[in-house]
Amino acid sequence: MRLPPFQELLDRNREAVYRFLVAAVGHQDADDCFQETFLAALRAYPRLERADNLRGWLLTIARNKALDHHRRQPQHPIPTDPLPEVAAPAADPDHTEVWTAVRRLPPKQMSAVIYRFVNDLPYRDIARLLDCTEEAARRNVHEALKKLRGATYE
């Protein structure tokens, strides 16, 4: 399968990638991570050999950029107070305590929750993006939700 022009790839996937980044890093830093994501994709695009699952490829790059962003941030203590119930997926990912807590989850759990509830991906696709089994993807989401409901952080 031939690769589409890069601009077409950008146009088709812009919203999904941006939603993921807003949930992963917040509105304030999403624009920078979005630009870094598509610059990295643009550099790698000519070397890409297959055109299957391009959205997954872009979301993987976005996930890596979000993780890089978190690594550059100063570490904050993890709150020990119980968290409110998990917000609906439509909740603004930049203005709730829940989404702040989501961003503090271990990287695979954070990504799994965002892929599932922001990008509405099936577990099969989440497993492919996280390079794990479908059962491990389900477990990552389950464990993350357990932590968000007030279980103690590891």
Question: Which functions belong to the PLM regions below?
Answer:
Residues 1-8, 18-36, 45-52, 134:
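Short, charged helix-capping/linker segments at alpha-helix termini
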Residues 4, 77-103:
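Acidic, proline/glycine-rich intrinsically disordered inter-domain spacer in sigma factors
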Residues 16, 97-100, 110-111:
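Pre-recognition alpha-helix immediately N-terminal to the DNA-recognition helix
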Residues 18, 38, 106, 110, ...:
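C-terminal flanking helix
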Residues 32-39, 52-64:
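Structural recognition of an alpha-helix C-terminal capping motif at a helix-to-coil junction
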Residues 46-50, 60-80, 91:
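Arg/Lys-rich amphipathic alpha helix in sigma70-family domain 2
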Residues 63, 67, 130-154:
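DNA-recognition helix of helix-turn-helix
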Residues 112-116:
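A short pre-motif secondary-structure segment
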